[in-house]
Structure formats: structure tokens, C-alpha cells
Amino acid sequence: MASEYTTSEYIKHHLTNATMCSTDNGIAFNKACSDAGFWAWHVDTLAWSIGLGLLFLIIFRSVASKATTGVPGKMQAFVELVVEFVDDNVKSTFHGKSALIAPLALTIFVWVLLMNLMDLVPVDLIPWVSGLIGQAAFGMDPHDVYNKAVPTTDLNLTFALASGVFILILFYSIKMKGIGGFAKELTMQPFGHPIFIPVNFILETVTLLARPLSLALRLFGNLYASELIFILIATIGYFQLPLHFMWAVFHILVLPLQAFIFMMLTIVYLSLACEDH
């Protein structure tokens, strides 16, 4: 597929989201949405993230409904291993009391991991299949059909995940400390004298906002760079296979690690929100 484009066109095509927007003439897609700005929807990110989320729910619900007290099957043993792994991390890290944290951590870890693992799919496969479908079903030029299959390479998705965590941080901070306690935390730390309230407020606000920002940018940056390297390797022709293999093997470690880091930072931030300083 790379031979059909120049190198820059190939990279741009594979890093472009399938976009949908509303115009004066109705619903438009891709290049027609170049000026839509904030009101453009990345439909591939939505489709893949929702689809992988449903896959997670289906698998775990199926295993839970068929779980036995006897010798577990391979799938049940794997799911139990994942659940115990997440639960142990929650118990050792989260010091508050909430039944929500463990299920939240499990959902974040598995969902982000599944989205990250899409990075191991050959970079040309999904765009090529999407181009064939677009051409056969809708008469579209395959070069104008986009399908970026790794949702975590979309800054919109990583910021959406981080925003959800940020809302929970605010919720637990106010729930555990009250509005007055939360306000005191923002204005009386790290310096306890009232004269330092403006300085404290600036420092604590920056610290608070840095948490979701770092969550979103860390996940996006690592996965975007990873996908870009896969695409660059694909442009070198037949010599790409050993490099693809080595980079994919390396990613077997990196992709779960990024999901784990996102989960652990979420637990840590929520634990800090529940602590009374």
C-alpha cells in the first residue's frame, strides 16, 4: 500500500482520523470537515473504542456468568488473574473506602490495554480493508477513506479518559473533605499562613490540573510515537519485516505498561483526593 503514495502522503493518510461533521448541506465526511474544528467527530476512534469496550464487557460477563468453584478453565483462570492483579494494586495503593475504585481500575486497565493492543495490527491491513469497502459500497476513492484503528493515538480520547478521572478527583475531594475542606486544601497548602493564599492557590491549581493533563499526554504521546514508528518502518519496503518483528516484540512490554501506568496513576490520584492532609 505504501507504494501508492509518496512517503509523506502515506504517513499522513495513516495518521488521519475518519471524520464526520454537520455542514449546511447535511452530514459530511473527512476532507469536507477540514474547517469543522471542535464540532468534527472522529468516527473511527468512537467505533473502535466503543467496540473494544463492549468486547471487554462481553468477555468478562460471560466468564463471570459461567464461573465455577471447581477447576477453572483457561479463560476463567486468565480473567481471575487479571482481576486479582488489579485488586491487589488497589488494596495496596488506595487508602480510602469506596467500592467504585476496584471496578474502575479494572475497566481502565483492560479497556486501555485492548485499545493499545490495536497497535500490533499490521499498519496497512485496516486502512486497506476500509478502502476496499469504501470503494465497493460507496464508490469512494480508497485514498480518501481513513480508519485509524488505535484509539489511544487520538488526543480526543486520551483527554476524555483523563477528564473522567479529573471529575472523580474533584468529586472525592469534595465528598471526603467538604467544599470548605477542599477550598482550604487549595488555599492553605503548602504554606499555612493566610498571606500566602494567592501563591498557594496558584500552586495547588497547577498541581491539580497537571494530573489529568499528564495522564492524557503520556498515553497519547507514547502510543502516537509507537504508531508513527510502525508506519515509518512500513515505508522501507521488503526490509521492514525484521524491524516490524523487533518493534512488535518490544511493544508486547510497552503496551501493557502504558495501561498499567494509567491505571496506577488514577488510583494514586483518587487516593490523594480521599486523604485529609
From Swiss-Prot:
Keywords: ATP synthesis, Cell inner membrane, Cell membrane, CF(0), Hydrogen ion transport, Ion transport, Membrane, Transmembrane, Transmembrane helix, Transport. Key component of the proton channel; it plays a direct role in the translocation of protons across the membrane. GO terms for biological process: proton motive force-driven plasma membrane ATP synthesis. The gene is atpB. The chain crosses the membrane at residues 40-60, 98-118, 154-174, 219-239, 245-265. F-type ATPases have 2 components, CF(1) - the catalytic core - and CF(0) - the membrane proton channel. CF(1) has five subunits: alpha(3), beta(3), gamma(1), delta(1), epsilon(1). CF(0) has three main subunits: a(1), b(2) and c(9-12). The alpha and beta chains form an alternating ring which encloses part of the gamma chain. CF(1) is attached to CF(0) by a central stalk formed by the gamma and epsilon chains, while a peripheral stalk is formed by the delta and b chains. This is ATP synthase subunit a. GO terms for cellular component: plasma membrane; proton-transporting ATP synthase complex. It is a multi-pass membrane protein. Its main location: membrane. Belongs to the ATPase A chain family. It comes from the Bacteria. It is found in: Cell inner membrane. GO terms for molecular function: proton-transporting ATP synthase activity, rotational mechanism.
